[in-house]
Amino acid sequence: MVKAVAAIVLVAIGAPAWAQMTPEGLWRNVDDKTGEAKAEIRIRDTGAGGLLGVLEKRLSKDAKPDDVCKECTDDRKDKPVLGLEIIRGAKKADGKDVWEGGKILDPENGRNYTLRLTPIEGGKKLEVRGSIGPFGRTQTWQRVE
């Protein structure tokens, strides 16, 4: 009985740490060049094993509430940037705390990049890598909640 209670307590204590080693949640996007907070993106599981990230809040000084994705070339063309799906389809890699295989959209230029998401620092930060072939860049996002 004591062993069972101890096991339950250990699982309960460790569960919050496990839950945070996922890209799901609300993240603040920080520009890797300027250090400026640009937006808040909510990432959630679609239920089909893939992730979806929606731009919930714009933080840039020059952001306008009625901005649309003029440069997008897919179903997001001319859609409001606020509420735009910028992450689609990333799935957890087998045996790793990495989500890949999806795409991330840069609403400023309309380009889609191959995506890799890696929670770091116990899930407090998220490495977001967007690439085309061997070329890409990495941003570190901060967990908001």
Descriptions of predicted regions:
Residues 123, 132-145:
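Edge beta-strand at a domain terminus
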Residues 13-19:
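Sec/Tat signal peptide C-region and signal peptidase I cleavage site
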Residues 34, 108, 121, 132-134:
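A generic beta-sheet turn/junction motif
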Residues 1-4:
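Positively charged n-region of N-terminal signal peptides that target proteins for export
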Residues 6-7, 17:
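Cleavable N-terminal signal peptides
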Residues 24, 29-115:
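Central antiparallel beta-sheet cores of small beta-barrel/beta-sandwich binding domains
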Residues 47, 120-122:
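Structural motif
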